[in-house]
Amino acid sequence: MGSTRKGMLNVLIAAVLWGSSGVCAQYIMEQSRMSSQFLTMIRLLFAGLILVTFSFMHGDKIFSILKNRKDALSLLIFSVVGALTVQLTFLLTIEKSNAATATVLQFLSPTIIVAWFALARRTRPGILVLTAILTSLIGTFLLVTHGNPTSLSISSAALFWGIASAFAAAFYTTWPSRLIAQYGTLPVVGWSMSFGGLILLPFYAKEGTHFAVSGSLILAFFYLVVIGTSLTFSLYLKGAQLIGGPKASILSCAEPLSSALLSLLLLGISFTLPDWLGTLLILSSVILISLDSRRRARAA
C-alpha cells in the first residue's frame, strides 16, 4: 500500500473511531449516571498517561518542556483552556443533547479559526472562506432550530456548551503550535491531558464511589480511553503526516457522520431532515476551508 493510501486510511479510521468515542461516552453516562466532569477526569488522566508513556518509549525527552518556566506556563494554559475545556464542554454537550449533535457543533471550530485570523490580521477572506462561514452559520441554524427561528430543537444549555466546545477546539488547535514544533506532539498533548485530569481530581474523585462498575462499563471505558482517544490520536497524526493537513481535514468529516449513524444504530437517536442538512452544510464548510488552505499552499 502506498504512503498516500495508507495515510488516507489512517485518517479515515481515526475519524470513525473519534465519532464512535462520543457515542461510547454517551452510553457510559446514560448507563452509569456518571457526570460529564468525572468522565472527563478519567478520560484525560488515563489517555494522558498512555500518550506520555508512549512518547517516552518513542525516545522523546518528555520532561524537557517542564524545565522551561515559560513553556511550562504555556503548557498549563493549554492544559486548562485547551485539553480540559475541549473535553469537558464536548461531554457536557452530549449530556445535554446527544453525541451526534455535540460532534457536529464542535466542527464549527475551523470556521471560528479562519474568522478569527481574518479579524486579527485585518485581511479580507477569500470567496471560499466567506462561503464556508456562511454555510456553517446556515448549517448551525438548521441544526439548532430545524428552520424555525422562534424555537430551539435542542436545549439552550446544549447550544451553549456546543458553541463553547467549538471555541475550545479552535483554541486547542491553534495555541500549542510553537510548543509542538519544539517538543513534539505526543509530549505536549500527553502532558496537557494528564494535567487537565489532575486539575479535576480533587473535585470529582469522590464520585467514583457513587455508581456500580459492571463488565460492560469497564469495556466501554477501555474503548473510550485506549481506542477512542489514544489509538485514534496516534492514527490521525500518522495519517496527517503522510497526506498533509488539508486532506486530513476533509477526511475527518467522516467523524460526525459516523457519530450520527452509530447514534441511530446503537442508541436509537434519529436525525431529521433539517439535522442532516445542517450537518452537511457544516461539513461542507470544513471542506471549503481545507480547499482554500490547499490553494494558498500551492500559490506560495
Swiss-Prot record:
Extract one GO cellular component term from the record. plasma membrane
For this protein, the parts annotated as crossing the membrane are 8-28, 46-66, 72-92, 100-120, 125-145, 152-172, 185-205, 217-237, 264-284
SUPFAM superfamilies referenced in this protein's UniProt entry, alphabetically: Multidrug resistance efflux transporter EmrE
Query: What main location does UniProt list?
Result: membrane
Q: What is the lineage of its organism?
A: Bacteria, Pseudomonadati, Pseudomonadota, Gammaproteobacteria, Enterobacterales
* Organism annotation: Salmonella typhimurium (strain LT2 / SGSC1412 / ATCC 700720)
Q: Which residues lie on this side of the membrane: Cytoplasmic?
A: 29-45, 93-99, 146-151, 206-216, 285-300
What is the protein's given name? Uncharacterized inner membrane transporter YicL
Tell me the membrane topology, using the record's own terms: Multi-pass membrane protein
Q: Which UniProt keywords apply?
A: Cell inner membrane, Cell membrane, Membrane, Repeat, Transmembrane, Transmembrane helix, Transport
Q: Does the keyword Membrane apply?
A: yes
Q: Which regions face the Periplasmic side of the membrane?
A: 1-7, 67-71, 121-124, 173-184, 238-263
